[in-house]
């Protein structure tokens, strides 16, 4: 069986793909796994396991930001599972030293303060100005998804992204 696998951005969850999943699930198999808090290796194993459970032999992988990092990890582990990829706002190379320092600093702040500050810190760079100005429902959904994340999962993911 063939389908689509949606891979969410940091620090979101599969809820970010609800509209896309709802649109496609009547036409083909769709997965949107949750992996916040896992290393990329563990996340790839989880995705492949969910694909196996669903009987999904191959897929088009859609990765946004951190989801794109995971697409590359999946391709290293199981290239035969790929029909194609859609990558957005991601990169194939490692973080710069400055980016790594910023991730570790953000990790420390999350562990100290929780996730309450993250929407204001991240949404300006995650959503375009037009979306922020004209689509309050999108902004609110993104804010809510971020606030649902556990500080521990966010902190662990920041380490995974830095390494």
Predicted regions and their residues:
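Conserved HGGG/HGGXW glycine-rich cap/lid loop of the alpha/beta-hydrolase fold
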Residues: 1-41, 50
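Conserved acidic catalytic loop of the alpha/beta-hydrolase fold
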Residues: 41-59
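Short beta-strand immediately N-terminal to the catalytic nucleophile in serine-hydrolase-like folds
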Residues: 61-63, 88
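Gly/Ala-rich beta-loop-alpha elbow adjacent to hydrolase catalytic centers
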Residues: 63-67, 71
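Flexible "cap/lid" loop of the alpha/beta hydrolase fold
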Residues: 72, 76-120, 126
């Amino acid at each position: 069986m063939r389908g689509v696998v949606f891979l969410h951005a940091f620090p979101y969850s599969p809820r970010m793909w609800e509209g896309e999943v709802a649109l496609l699930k009547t036409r083909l198999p769709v997965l949107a796994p949750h992996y916040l808090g896992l290393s990329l290796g563990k996340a790839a194993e989880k995705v492949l396991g969910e694909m196996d459970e669903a009987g999904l032999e191959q897929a088009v992988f859609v990765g946004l930001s951190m989801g794109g990092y995971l697409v590359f990890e999946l391709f290293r582990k199981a290239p035969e599972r790929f029909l194609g990829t859609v990558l957005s706002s991601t990169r194939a190379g490692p973080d710069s030293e400055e980016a790594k320092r910023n991730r570790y600093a953000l990790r420390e702040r999350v562990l100290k303060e929780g996730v309450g500050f993250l929407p204001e810190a991240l949404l300006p760079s995650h959503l375009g100005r037009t979306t922020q100005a004209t689509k309050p429902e999108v902004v609110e959904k993104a804010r809510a998804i971020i606030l649902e994340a556990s500080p521990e999962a966010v902190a662990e993911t920041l380490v995974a992204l830095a390494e």
